[in-house]
Amino acid sequence: MEIQEISKLAIEALEDIKGKDIIELDTSKLTSLFQRMIVATGDSNRQVKALANSVQVKLKEAGVDIVGSEGHESGEWVLVDAGDVVVHVMLPAVRDYYDIEALWGGQKPSFAVGAAKPWSAV
């Protein structure tokens, strides 16, 4: 399965569970570890876990190997590693605090650019 197809499936899985502020970054020129990074936000720990689980289930059904997954215990930041595609699902405050989009050359989604945020990073 091609990387674009895997990314599309992961994004669909996030949208199915109402993931917010979903972005996809092409990291192929930045690292050889993975080709795409997808970042999404969930409103609660429970939703973050459900979003990550949805990604895992949808990718497994399509025959994609899941290398690993971390963060299900707390549900604040869950990572799903599907080899060439890595998915990060976070609570809003965690996403704002770590700003991994900027670390990988992306832009913060519109909710963080000049918009009033309903949270603040500690």
From Swiss-Prot:
Pfam families per UniProt: RsfS (PF02410)
Record GO biological process: cytosolic ribosome assembly; negative regulation of ribosome biogenesis; negative regulation of translation
InterPro entries registered for this protein in UniProt: Iojap/RsfS/C7orf30, NT_sf
Keywords: Cytoplasm, Repressor, Translation regulation
Entry-linked HAMAP family: Iojap_RsfS (MF_01477)
Family, as annotated: Belongs to the Iojap/RsfS family.
Protein name as annotated: Ribosomal silencing factor RsfS
Source organism of this protein record: Chromobacterium violaceum (strain ATCC 12472 / DSM 30191 / JCM 1249 / CCUG 213 / NBRC 12614 / NCIMB 9131 / NCTC 9757 / MK)
Taxon lineage: Bacteria, Pseudomonadati, Pseudomonadota, Betaproteobacteria, Neisseriales
